Amino acid sequence: KVGESNDRTIKGDSEYSWALQDISFDVKQGDIIGIIGKNGAGKSTLLKILSKVTGPSKGTIKSKGRIAALLEVGTGFHPELTGRENIFLNGTILGMTKKEVATKLDEIVEFAGVERYLDTPVKRYSSGMMVRLGFSVAAHLEPEILIVDEVLAVGDAEFQKKCIGKMSDVAKGGRTILFVSHNMGSVKALCNKGILLENGRKVFEGSVNDTIAKYVINKVDT
């Protein structure tokens, strides 16, 4: 549960503006929630707080289970380590043993399409390669909660479609997904619920179709 999660950004010398304010919602096991809104609505800040990358200035987050997040290009990767080493590093962070990660290694590498560069430091990867490997690691290491930001837009259309399919498979296993995207087609195809943010506040929560409709109406009105 997210209770009044807030994050502040400095505005001027002494004034503060809240990036998020008065947000509260429950996420149940197996929910696939699309979080939508215009640029600057607070979507990425919310995901950072839920992923525990950033702490809320006020309020609390209560969660159960392992959380894997893909928030930005290179999230969770050490640039000097190879792709292989980073896969094992991320598995360790999620509380997995080396043996558990090893059983997933081939599947992760094949999905990401980085076989030739597996033992190359990731600082030499292109942004597209980083995103492919980052998503593959997050999705295949079986977290209870998967959080994915708009970073998938860096990949090509074919890979984005592949990711939507994989997230759908993950969700069928009873896992929870929080997904931010400006691609309403992807949100509609994947999610069963939606949350609409506007100026750091939750202005609507409901079925994914109703949430998208509200978002479109708000865009037309402005």
Q: Which residues make up each language-model segment?
A:
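Conserved ABC ATPase "signature" C-loop
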Residues: 199-200, 215
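Conserved catalytic segment of ABC-fold P-loop ATPases
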Residues: 189-196
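H-loop/switch region of ABC-family ATPase nucleotide-binding domains
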Residues: 181-182
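The feature captures the beta-strand-to-loop junction immediately N-terminal to the Walker
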Residues: 36-38
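Pre-NBD coupling/linker segments of ABC/ABC-like ATPases
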Residues: 1-22, 208-222
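Conserved ABC ATPase "signature" region
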Residues: 3-6, 88, 100-117
